[in-house]
Amino acid sequence: MARRWQVEQLGGDSVLIPNGVDTARFRKAQAPRAEDDERPLEIVFLGRLDEPRKGLDILLAALAQVQRPFHCTVIGGGTPRHVPNVTYAGRVSDQEKAEILGRADIYVAPNTGGESFGIVLVEAMAAGCAVVASDIEAFRTVCNADSAEPAGLLFANGDSADLARSLQQLIDAPDERAVLQQRGRERAAVFDWDKVSEEVMRVYETVADGTKVHMR
């Protein structure tokens, strides 16, 4: 949507620069699981519990269908739903959020819409999580979903059964999960402030000297 609007309103020579995210805190928080670690896989959700478009109830419905051991940590304010294997952390500091994501195996973003970007997806990727996200345009972009090597696993928007299948797929396939985690780390680097600030400076420089911008 952002790129289409850009071309229609600003012309084909305009340049789209991604949002910048401070990923350093999340990179440092990574705590990879040891090979002999037999704890259930850790799944994390972050969002306002009482806002339907954040998709918590979609996630909880999916978790009820997962026939594998897991634990889920829910971050965010609102009214908890007391279901098995789910812990509510409430509102947390940025450092606490980084530590929770750094310990997690999978981050789930079941949002149904109204998202212009997906900062927390980038944060989760930087922290080493495999990202599972609803198939909405903002998340497709962050996950580089149309590339040969997507950095996230998308499920049908609002479909708890499809989300359950995606989660079970990653729980059952540690190698696939590890590939997504590595791609996520690499994808998060694209949105890091250091990288984005370089692109901004390149745009300023090319505007100043009149040359055409080619984003890397």
Question: What role is predicted for each listed range?
Answer:
Residues A98, L121-A126, E137-T141:
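Short alpha-helical segment that forms part of, or immediately flanks, the ligand-binding pocket
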Residues I106, A130-A133, R140:
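Short hydrophobic beta-strand element within catalytic cores of glycosyltransferases
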